[in-house]
């Protein structure tokens, strides 16, 4: 059963991939033409048509060139989706057997690597932590697959799209079932690669290409630190499998690395390097810049990346390595600081964004910050609880955005929407439920998990915990404001584009069913599981999959916080709702006036704190200058000038000068002969005189 959960998506990928290859060969028997021969021109004309209507081509979720689909496209869709639903059902069964039935599963698959002292076996490790992730990954992926059948119905390359989705899911499943750091790293890099392919799926769009490359490169920065962390763990323990590492972890306390003139605590260094990987993969502060640009990919990709796969990998990794982080309080302080700063930063940026998908993207960034605050204060199960609930309502919001985009003919700017509640009522109510859960409305899924994080931060004993508490409380109010801003500007008020508004309609049934299912999860994923993740049943539920230090009483103390602490998140949620209603329903002139009055602040937030511009100045432009200099000076002038090109140029110079001697005049040749004879006689005389 457990092997089937992991490998069924891989089987679906292979089937869809073969259909995609066959379709490509049938469409282009002589090989795929250049971008100017197919697709690109059609896509440019499609974008130009949007521009002709006065719209920003950047703010559209286009579906690529209009070409006939490959034969077997429907089979590829149905096969991958069916296999994912089977995997989902098996995952829920595994959750019951492992999480509730106290069963654990270990299965070796193959001997992976044997080099010197390094031995890595590829095996499946299914404990409660894994079971939770299996449910999240397969459930969200299954509904994203079903949703994509309707969303991508006009795309001729959908077999390739479904192959990518399934391989993305398999990579994440390989990551969460990993029994060693090396296997986890392969899954880690797999989701990174697949995010690159899916974000850049419409590769004829320059914006999609740029976003894919940006995501790939920013994650390489984090992955470099993650790699160093794995090397350091192997150096300290001589192993990469989790059981050996965790058994030796207590003995590593007090060990140091001597670096330059410093003696650094070994566990702190290791945990910080590993967390650097989590910062990149989970789009935390400083390595967050790729996440909003990832919206250039198809909307189902956004839902899968943000709800169940790539961005949750960092949170899962910290939870899996809780035996190490519990012994490194300084590293935990850094985790809290980065998480809390991310939660607040992303919430402030989300206040003024106008792209419907980017608003939800920044909410993801912010909510991931909440999860890391929980991890930093030692409330690992609470962080996993928020990961679990967040997956349902965040996937719901993204897929709801996709339905809005389809209804508005691929428009994504909320300033051009309005009044859609009457045109797409089902989508409205589904997004309404998702917004309630995101803002933490009482008794929704988000209410139980997000409030628990704030309470855990309040009682945390880490010196940075109070900073986490303050930031998450403020972010709760901001989250409520920008979430309801999105709802009010999209679905309420007067329509701003009457042409698109009149033509708006509900999407295909395959897109509506996932919305309904995820809305159910957004409501019910909280209360039934609250005791397992945050109550007295945590130790029995997670058993050895999470480690809590002897002095870690956060889960117990968080149930005894003052009443004002427990009520603060709800008050902030209500305050954000009231302000948004005042600004965008009752007095829509207020935000316009405030934007004019505080233009520097508004521009600062609109430009995302200028991180893109800062990184462009500090890293991108210098790197481009270095590359251009090495190309022009190093390669062109030095290597080619004194190497192959230089030798050939000198040969040409010599032959050019020799050719000049061939004048064609007889007296020139006679003169040359006389000079030669004279030179010979002179040499002979001197040579003879020497003897």
Where are these regions (language model features)?
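Transmembrane helix-loop-helix hairpins at membrane boundaries of multipass inner-membrane proteins
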Residues: 1-3, 19-142, 146-163, 236-262, ...
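Alpha-helical transmembrane segments
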Residues: 14-21, 143-145, 347-349, 486, ...
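Hydrophobic alpha-helical membrane-insertion segments
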Residues: 82-99, 222-235, 431-439, 514-535, ...
